[in-house]
Amino acid sequence: FTMIGSGKNIKSIAYVENVSEFIDHSLNFSSGLYIFNYVDKPDMNMNELVTIIKKTLKVKSIINLKIPYFLAIILGFVADFVGYIFRKNIPISSIRVKKFCADTQFDTSVNSTEFVASHSLEEAIKKTLEFEFSKQR
């Protein structure tokens, strides 16, 4: 895995089982219109997420390569240009670099509903990885 930038960018994440449980919980609300952004808290930065992923997948990399943002965005623009010239969709692009390095942190008012998620964010990430990378899939 190659980190772009410092890895301190914050990410808000929602685990699908927790979202499902919240929807079930919301069926008990009195009638009316309710609008929620659902995210599991606490938010994590990319360094924390990568640490959980490596630990769960038992990845032991000696070298943790970090590419400075300015270099990655230049490579992204080069990839954009090459993709445009050859009419090919290239896996790296300036937009993907920007999205990866951006903070995607959202507030949630779910806590005001007395809902308690049954899965912590770390547990949710581990369960997702174990499912996605299991041999029985």
Task: Label the predicted regions.
Residues 1-4, 109-110:
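Short small-residue beta-strand/loop micro-motif enriched in glycine and branched aliphatics
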Residues 25-89, 120-137:
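Mid/C-terminal beta-alpha module of Rossmann-like enzyme folds, strongest
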Residues 17-20, 47, 109, 122:
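Residues in well-ordered alpha-helical elements
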Residues 113-117:
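Aromatic-glycine-rich donor-binding/catalytic loop that engages nucleotide-sugar donors
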Residues 46, 91-108:
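Active-site loop of classical SDR/Rossmann-like NAD(P)-dependent oxidoreductases
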Residues 5-27, 34:
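Substrate-positioning beta->alpha
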